[in-house]
Design a protein with these regions (language model features):
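Conserved hydrophobic "DFG−1" position in protein kinase catalytic cores
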Residues: 11-12, 19, 86-88, 103
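NUDIX/MutT-family hydrolases
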Residues: 85, 94-125
Length: 130
């Protein structure tokens, strides 16, 4: 079974959370996700998180604490996602490697079509905030 390790950013500003819509082609195309991407061989997860935010959205970020690690198995692939708390420190938000991005309130995240791993992560956030 192939194993892929990915980083994802939980970025919150003024009570709203940054979400990115995946490009239509590829796995989970068109779904909304916490922005991030695959760790390259030998790459540090925190470095990957910073690189992916710059590549996908044109922003620099402070990569903070690991919030959660979620594992899913789909089509003979295990995908492990490391969710980091991040804060934007520079750059200008742009949809570079995604269809679009938007800031949403916590209640709006429920209605978004998300990959299974992001849905699991968000369920954990809801429980933790109660």
């Amino acid at each position: 079974m192939e194993q892929i390790v990915v980083t994802a950013a939980f970025i919150r500003e003024d009570g709203r959370i940054l979400m990115a819509k995946r490009l239509p082609k590829g796995p989970e195309g068109g779904k909304w996700e916490f922005p991030g991407g695959k760790i390259e061989p030998g790459e540090d997860p925190r470095s990957c998180m910073g690189r992916e935010l710059l590549e996908e959205l044109g922003i620099q970020a402070e990569v903070g604490a690991v919030l959660e690690v979620v594992s899913t198995v789909k089509e003979l692939r295990q995908i492990i996602i490391i969710y980091f708390e991040c804060r934007i420190t520079g750059g200008e938000l742009q949809a570079i490697e995604c269809q679009q991005f938007k800031w949403v309130g916590p209640e709006e995240i429920e209605a978004l079509d998300k990959p299974e791993s992001d849905a699991k992560f968000w369920d954990g956030r809801k429980i933790a905030s109660k």
